Amino acid sequence: KEKLHITYNQLENLVNHFIDYLLNNFKKNELFKSPIAIHSSANLCSTISMLACAKLGITHCVLFNDLSKEAIEIRCKLIKCKILITASDDKDFTSKIKQIKKKLRIKVLRFSDSKNSNVSVNTDNFYKKKNIIKKFKYIFFESNKNSFILFTSGSTGEPKGIVHSTGGYLVYSKYTCSEKFNISDKTIILTASDAGWINGHTYALYGPLSLGATTIILEKPMMLLNPNILKEILFNL
């Protein structure tokens, strides 16, 4: 039940550090020609990854934590991704990813507090980064530029990737948060859905951040293993 408090300034710094990592460790055609897949949808790593991609104008696709190997593989194949970002240390998942990596010829970027050689970004060190790295300026895009892809469940056949544009999506995110939920920079919001679903994109991340609100992001396994955690959070807000 660890708590991590991140200010807007600290979040920007972490995003810039991750952008620097991406630009220094991957070729441009790997980063910009195909969408990036982001697994591990319920933690800070996915938040940083999503915002880094958005800032660089890289179309990204968040994959729900509990998807099977087959479900992950078909989504990676459909978007033709060359990079998969994950924060999972699960041994079973790691073996599955190795198979997907080999079959689809993708590179895997792993966030972890582990010290093993498969880890790309050590979170113990990464989250403690205090030094201010050069600020990466936001790039101006056409409003209809693809921002991210989110897949349907696939329960009625092959999953379908729903493309969300930069301008239209951000306008509706900010509008609904402001006008329907009365969210402002004084608001603390808890959206229990993770980024594997549209509510996690809109009401845990992009909408609240666009209005300067404080958003609480839950690591999903914590809630599933101990439902009292949700009650504890609500009583301590």
What does each of the following model-derived ranges do?
Residues 1-7, 115-119:
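AMP-dependent adenylate-forming
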Residues 4-9, 140, 147-171:
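Conserved AMP-binding A3 loop
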Residues 12-20, 162-182:
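Conserved structural elements of the adenylate-forming
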Residues 21-67, 190-195:
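Conserved AMP-binding/adenylate-forming
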Residues 40-42, 58-76, 88-93, 194, ...:
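ATP-dependent adenylate-forming carboxylate-activation enzymes
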Residues 51, 55-127:
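Structural core segment of the AMP-binding/adenylate-forming
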Residues 116-145, 170-172:
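Flexible, low-complexity linker/hinge segments
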Residues 170-188, 198-237:
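Conserved AMP-binding/adenylation subdomain of ANL enzymes
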